[in-house]
UniProtKB/Swiss-Prot annotation:
Biological source species: Mycobacteroides abscessus (strain ATCC 19977 / DSM 44196 / CCUG 20993 / CIP 104536 / JCM 13569 / NCTC 13031 / TMC 1543 / L948)
An individual GO BP term: translation
Protein name per UniProt: Large ribosomal subunit protein bL21
The encoding gene: rplU
Pfam families: Ribosomal_L21p
Domain of life, source organism: Bacteria
Amino acid sequence: MATYAIVKTGGKQYKVAVGDLVKVEKIDSEPGSSVQLPVALVVDGATVTTDADKLAKVAVTGEIVEHTKGPKIRIHKFKNKTGYHKRQGHRQRLTVLKVTGIK
């Protein structure tokens, strides 16, 4: 079984392993810089670690590959019988991370 971890960033949790490319909420750092992510769970073969004291010693490091945007989301609000229409669009800013190590 492979080693993987559950990391928390941007209010979400992601399952990552070494070498994975993960799209996460935007992180304010330059591409090429290294970041450390907080760990919620580590699985190493048959061993599952959830103890907060042991997880404090575990570090998941990653390298920022690029900043990008997610797909276009279209919002349309409509009120009946009043002529109210509101169209709005949104593209979430994302960061592509390459996981370099789980130690």
